Design a protein with these regions (language model features):
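A generic "binding-loop/recognition-motif" signal
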Residues: 2, 23, 65-66, 138, ...
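Short, well-ordered alpha-helical microsegments
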Residues: 3-4, 115, 176-177
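Short, structured coil segments at secondary-structure junctions
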Residues: 13-15, 23, 31, 125-128, ...
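Active-site phosphate-binding/coordination module
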Residues: 1-77
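Mg2+-dependent phosphoryl-transfer enzymes with acidic/Ser/Thr/Gly-rich catalytic loops
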Residues: 141-222
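Conserved strand-loop elements at the edges of beta-sheets that form or border functional pockets
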Residues: 21, 134, 206
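Class I S-adenosyl-L-methionine
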Residues: 4, 8-11, 54, 119-124, ...
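Conserved acidic, metal-coordinating active-site core of Asp-based
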Residues: 48-52, 56-170
Length: 222
């Protein structure tokens, strides 16, 4: 939902385009509004996620429509996620009781050093049942197995009949690395994490300097 206002500003409903959201867990065709692909976390694993995180000094979140669902609506990192994606926050008394709908992604937020231990704990508990990775030092993504931005981009590429060499991808977060490595042209923002810059083909200007527009002008329109 964070990119929906941008998609509307670009008039993608008229001109066509796709939104790959939730780290690739969902693909939406902007011209029709139809979800053409979605993979959700098996419901039987939700109890395990909740059980592993509930008693920790961390905030567990998921998404329902344009709302963030959490037991900790006042948490600073919940507020940050709300601000980044322009989503409202709904506080609930019991996360597991409330979340009976299909879940594309869960997010765990905490201070970076502490979250590293949480990441190790969850990976040890779930093994290969889920994709668990950091998008920011303070955000830990919990996704369905084999879901990341690269796998979603490949799914869309095959549907559109494109070659990898025809794809450019811009990113700044740790969860963008797979996508940047997959694309024929991988572009990191100037404000990107250093790990992202190390794997890219080109570093563009920062988000604040309209770096995506700069890259489009240089490599596509230019």
């Amino acid at each position: 939902y964070g990119v929906v206002p941008t998609a509307r500003e670009l008039e993608l409903e008229q001109y066509g385009g796709f939104i790959l959201s939730y780290n690739g867990g969902r693909i939406v065709d902007c011209s029709t509004g139809r979800t053409i692909y979605e993979k959700t976390i098996p419901h039987k694993l939700m109890g395990g996620i909740y059980g592993q995180v509930h008693d920790l000094d961390a905030a567990l979140m998921t998404y329902e429509g344009d709302r963030i669902i959490t037991e900790k609506p006042q948490d600073a990192y919940v507020a940050k996620e709300s601000f980044i994606n322009k989503m409202k926050v709904k506080g609930v008394g019991n996360f597991l009781d409330y979340v009976t709908f299909p879940v594309v992604k869960c997010l765990v937020a905490a201070d970076g050093g502490y979250l590293e231990a949480v990441e190790d704990k969850l990976k040890g508990y779930f093994g290969s049942q889920l994709s668990i990775f950091r998008s920011e030092p303070y955000f830990l993504e919990i996704m369905p197995k084999d879901i990341d931005k690269a796998s979603s981009l490949e799914r869309l590429r095959l549907q559109l009949g494109l070659e990898r060499a025809e794809i450019a991808a811009c990113g700044d977060g740790l969860n963008d690395i797979s996508m940047i490595q997959y694309a024929g042209l991988g572009i990191a923002m100037a404000n990107a994490q250093e790990a992202v810059k190390r794997v890219c083909d080109f570093v563009t200007k920062s988000n604040e300097e309209e770096g995506v527009a700069y890259a489009i002008d240089r490599f596509i329109l230019g």
